[in-house]
Amino acid sequence: RPWEIGVLATVGRARVRTHRRPRVAILVNGDELVSLEDFDEVLAGRRIVDSNSHALAAAVRAAGCEPRLLGIARDDEGSIRERLSAGLECDAIVTVAGASVGEHDLVKRALAGMGFRLDFWRVRMKPGNPFSFGHLDGVPVFGLPGNPVSAGVTFEVLVHPALRLMLGRSAVHSPTIGVATGETLEPLADRVQFLRVRLEKEARGTFTARRTGPQGSGILSSLARADALLVVPAGDEPIPAGTRLAAIPLPAPDEGQASSGF
């Protein structure tokens, strides 16, 4: 922080040990995806634009790390292995899609063929259940679901804390604040939900969380409009409006960075 640098100058420290910004490789997978340069394919209804690369690169920068885009790997194990090999030069790899069970989920097979060690797969959370984590040649690999909201939520809840650890931060877990629910909520019996919400400040200084709209895992606007994730614990009974729950504030726009990173 600026004033810490001032303190160092005050005590005559011209050089200090620091943590290098981790380099994070990002790989997306899918024959249906195209880059922004080929947006005409999207307009023609033949393809889907790759939004995850841009969103995750911005999230990695906001976390204080350096993103490296590995591009779009096609549904071919050779293509996936080639791009993953390039990512081994980085400090961490984030893959998007190919983390769930399905005939087109080739990332796991490609990783297995390269000697990947899977530490765990599946987390009892929604969205983001098919998240995976392991190591490839000593490099941590985070496997995110392909749906944009699932990818964004798992990054904030599971990947961001790991990046804080790599940066040498003492506080690695995402901070939470207590908020009141703005409506009755229906919890899931077997997993924690992370609802995208806006926090409204009340006259008495407390906050009320209200959903940003439909919460489908493909509705990226629900995350774009949110300033927090409301943590809804698993349970069998409805949660009445006004109940106090924890919320994870999402990173605010950086005043010093006007560029979107495109």
PLM segments and residue spans:
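Short, glycine/charged-enriched hinge/interface segments at domain edges or termini
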Residues: 1-69, 213-214, 249-251, 262
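Residue-level signal for inorganic ion chemistry
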Residues: 26, 60, 94, 197, ...
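A generic local secondary-structure boundary/capping motif
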Residues: 10-18, 45-47, 84, 121, ...
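Hydrophobic/aromatic beta-strand patches that form the interior of the parallel beta-sheet core
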Residues: 27, 68-71, 140-142, 177
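A general structural motif
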Residues: 47-53, 73-78, 121-130
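Short glycine-rich anion-binding loops that position phosphate/pyrophosphate groups of nucleotides
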Residues: 31-32, 98-101, 146
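Flexible glycine/proline-rich
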Residues: 110-262
